């Protein structure tokens, strides 16, 4: 027995830009789809839900840094002066990396939900490592924004 599964390439509906808090930019789901090469096999609703949850997580983690910058007179991330050794737009780029990586990790963990067979369970186990890699990318991007090292080591 053989089967054919078509991978979609068109979007199922027009995706609305997800509004952010004013300090960080609004996020068009199409940017996430393009940067992470996600086609229409993942529905717009799933993409938007993952992005909204990721934005909430990353915004919460960066809330103190954001408050510090706003108090210093920078109402948006674009207003923050970039250190001379960094590329222009570095804070925005790192923020998008953190949000997109967090959202992608969430989506990867859900792929096994499509199929209750043994192959789905095996596929879910294989996808655990990429999800962890995306979470690590998000954590490192947040650390870079905050000016912290990527890891903390303690002597026991």
Model-flagged regions — what are they?
Residues 1-80, 143, 149-156:
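Conserved short "hinge" loops at termini or chain/domain junctions
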Residues 19-20, 28, 87, 91, ...:
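A general marker of short, structured functional hotspots
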Residues 75-82, 124-128:
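Amphipathic alpha-helical surface "interface" segments used
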Residues 78-94:
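Short, glycine/alanine-rich amphipathic alpha-helical segment
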